[in-house]
Curated annotation (Swiss-Prot):
This is Aquaporin. Water channel required to facilitate the transport of water across membranes. Involved in osmotolerance. The keyword Membrane applies. The gene is AQP. It is found in: Cell membrane. The keyword Cell membrane applies. Keywords: Cell membrane, Membrane, Repeat, Transmembrane, Transmembrane helix, Transport.
Length: 242
C-alpha cells in the first residue's frame, strides 16, 4: 500500500469512526430520554448534540473532513469544495459509521433490538404533523446548518479580489468553526422537538431505517435535508461571492 492510498484509507476510517461516535452519542441521548419519558428530552438531546459535535470536530479535523453529516459532504462536492471521489468515499464512511452506531446502542441498552430501533428512528412526533411540516422543518434546519458550516469552516476565506471589503485583511474564522458549528447543532436540536424531532442529518435517519426496516417518511427526511443543505451551500458560495 503506497503512502497516498494509506492516507486516503486513514481519512475514510477517521470519518467512519467520527460518525459512529456522534451517532452513538445522539442515539444514546434519545434512548435515555424516550425510555424514561423524561420531560427534559429536548434539552438532553440538544446539549448532547452540541457538546459531542464540538469535541469530535476538534478531535477529527486533522484526520478527515469531520462532517459526520452526508448533507454537508454532498453540498461540499456539489459546490466544488471537495473532490468527488473522495467525497463519495466520505459519505459511504459516514453511512457505515451510523449503522455501527445503531448496533452499538443495541448492545448497550436493555430494550431489545426492535424496541431500540423504534426508539431511535427519525419520525414525525405526532399524526398532527403534516408532510409539509416535516419537509420544511428539516429543509430549514439543514439549510441553516450547512450555510453556517460553509461560512465558518468549509468556505471561510473569500477569494482574493472577491471580498466586499477590498483592502481590509480578512479574519480567519475557521479556528472557531468547531465551536460555532457545535453550538449551531445544539440550538437547532431545540427547534423541532414537536415536529420532525430535529434530525437535519441523513446519516442519523439512515442508520435506524436500514437496520430497523422502518422507512416511514425516510424519503421525505433525506430529500428535505439534502435539498436544504444544497441551498445553504449554494447561497454561501455563489451569492455571497466566497
Amino acid at each position: 500500500m503506497n503512502t497516498s492510498t494509506k492516507l486516503i484509507c486513514q481519512k475514510l476510517f477517521a470519518e467512519m469512526l467520527c460518525s459512529c461516535i456522534f451517532g452513538f452519542a445522539v442515539y444514546s441521548a434519545i434512548l435515555n430520554t424516550k425510555a424514561s419519558n423524561s420531560s427534559i428530552s429536548s434539552t438532553t438531546v440538544g446539549l448532547t448534540v452540541c457538546f459531542s459535535s464540538i469535541s469530535l470536530i476538534y478531535t477529527f479535523c486533522d484526520h478527515s473532513v469531520a462532517h459526520f453529516n452526508p448533507a454537508i459532504t454532498i453540498a461540499a462536492i456539489c459546490t466544488g469544495k471537495l473532490d468527488i471521489l473522495l467525497g463519495i468515499g466520505y459519505v459511504i464512511a459516514q453511512l457505515i459509521g451510523f449503522i455501527l452506531a445503531t448496533l452499538l446502542t443495541v448492545v448497550c441498552f436493555p430494550y431489545g433490538y426492535l424496541k431500540t430501533m423504534e426508539f431511535i428512528a427519525s419520525a414525525r412526533i405526532s399524526d398532527d404533523i403534516s408532510t409539509v411540516n416535516l419537509f420544511f422543518t428539516e429543509f430549514i434546519l439543514s439549510f441553516i446548518l450547512v450555510f453556517i458550516a460553509f461560512e465558518v469552516g468549509i468556505n471561510a476565506i473569500r477569494e482574493p479580489g472577491v471580498t466586499l471589503f477590498v483592502g481590509i485583511k480578512q479574519i480567519d474564522r475557521s479556528k472557531f468553526a468547531p465551536l460555532t458549528i457545535g453550538i449551531t447543532l445544539g440550538f437547532l436540536a431545540f427547534l423541532a422537538s414537536t415536529t420532525s424531532g430535529g434530525a437535519f442529518n441523513p446519516g442519523i435517519v439512515w442508520g435506524p431505517a436500514i437496520m430497523g426496516g422502518n422507512f416511514d417518511d425516510f424519503v421525505i427526511y433525506i430529500i428535505s435535508e439534502l435539498s436544504g443543505g444544497l441551498l445553504g451551500a449554494f447561497i454561501q458560495v455563489f451569492l455571497l461571492f466566497k
